[in-house]
């Protein structure tokens, strides 16, 4: 517990990315694409999600979308300007657009998505005030998804 509190105080991005990574592991255990997301406000988790596209037969059931919905329901508000989204993989264009409309205050992602990430389309998909940080736990976040797809081939 002491180490957890210390990490939260000294490196909150890594702390919350570890929790997003746990969501990705849950997706992996259900044979879903292993991506996890957490929405945080004032160091409190208010939404979380992992990919459930196969389980729900819903192409929009990405980790970010589920986490945004949970956070909005928790707050009773559609705008998340004071919130930070932690997600293990760079959001796709669909999720980036949803993050724009939700006015997410900050996005922290682990690994870049060289094939389907929003930055491959445009850096202007997000709200102009949204701050972006990347590369938190990049190696672990990249490995879980790379290994998943290697196992599928």
For each of these PLM feature ranges, what is it?
Residues 1-28, 91-153:
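Zinc-dependent deaminase
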Residues 46-53, 129:
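Short beta->alpha transition motifs characteristic of CBS
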């Amino acid at each position: 517990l002491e180490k957890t509190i210390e990490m939260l105080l000294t490196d909150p991005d890594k702390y919350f990315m570890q929790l997003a990574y746990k969501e990705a592991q849950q997706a992996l255990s259900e044979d879903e694409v292993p991506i996890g997301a957490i929405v945080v406000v004032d160091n409190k988790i208010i939404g979380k999600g992992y990919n459930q596209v196969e389980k729900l037969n819903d192409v929009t059931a990405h980790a970010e979308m589920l986490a945004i919905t949970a956070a909005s329901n928790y707050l009773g508000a559609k705008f998340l300007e004071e919130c930070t989204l932690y997600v293990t993989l760079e959001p796709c264009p669909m999720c980036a657009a949803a993050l724009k409309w939700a006015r997410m205050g900050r996005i922290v992602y682990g690994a870049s998505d060289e094939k389907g990430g929003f930055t491959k389309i445009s850096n202007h998909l997000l709200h102009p005030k949204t701050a972006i940080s990347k590369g938190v736990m990049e190696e672990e976040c990249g490995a879980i998804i790379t290994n998943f797809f290697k196992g599928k081939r």
